[in-house]
Amino acid sequence: MAKKVLPTVLALILLLSACGSRLPSPTGTPAHQEPSPTVAPTPESTPYDGPVSPLSGLPMGKEWVNRRPVAIMLNNLKEALPQLGQSQADVIYEVPAEGGITRMLAVYQSLDGVGKIGSIRSARPYYLELALGHDAIYIHAGGSEDAYAKIRQWGVTALDGVNGPYMSNSENGNLMWRDPERRKSYSLEHTVVTTGTSIIERLPTYGLRLEHEDGYRCQMNFVEDGTPTGGAEAPRITVPVSHYKTGVFTYDPDSRGGDPADGRKVKGATIHWVDAA
């Protein structure tokens, strides 16, 4: 009896094994599936917590904190264009002057990366008042008799390229010089220039007060994200001054700045129009 049982059991095991090894027939060719792309997580930006310029609200180096800004007289005659360095100023004042012309006062809180600046022109009393409002070091080339009198009377820290020891006949030979390239095609009064590097290197050698006095506070305030608090959109502003000059300021939404005469974008500059009565 035992001999009959064993073959039966073995046959049953073989049958079960055969049934278990049979695979179902494929019903069709499976479609090729592309692997899902891996989406990299968006890195979180670290909020800037360093010093910002009190004149523009933009980041600046720690070495400029509490430093007096530099206010430079800039030529604005058509014959003197293009201007140099105005696009890197923190604040630009364009003020009507005599004869229907205007001149600009460019105020720089930080001079990092600022290249050639010019052409530098002469002082007038109303620009002195603007410079004093910022406790700025005033750089100019010449001036009216009234301006020279006010510089002495008001105690303006003024560096004069015409009647002072700040002019050189050679490039980078002093705080200011007459640009060799401009001298080839411009009148002499349109050739005085300086650079951010020259100002940085030479100001400490003049024995001037370079920092604001205790208690000084800048009167400008800026919203943290740069969003305007009110008003209408103004992509283009036209300011008629006289038969000679009409100021035009065009806003570039890509760079969030204006398009100045030298072809560079104004980055973060604050442009004030002051009508001198």
What do these predicted ranges mean?
Residues K3-A11:
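Sec-dependent signal peptide recognition
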Residues L23, Q33-E34:
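Positively charged, low-complexity intrinsically disordered regions
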Residues L16-A18:
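C-terminal motif of bacterial Sec signal peptides marking the signal peptidase cleavage site
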Residues L6, L23-P24, Q83:
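Short N-terminal micro-motifs specific to bacterial/archaeal maturation
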Residues G20-G28:
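Bacterial lipoprotein signal-peptidase II cleavage site
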Residues G28, P35-Y93, E98-A277:
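A surface/extracellular/periplasmic glyco- and lipid-processing/surface-interacting theme
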Residues K3-K4, R22, R68, R103:
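Basic side chains
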Residues A2-K3, V266:
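Generic cytosolic/nucleocytoplasmic N-terminal low-complexity/intrinsically disordered segments
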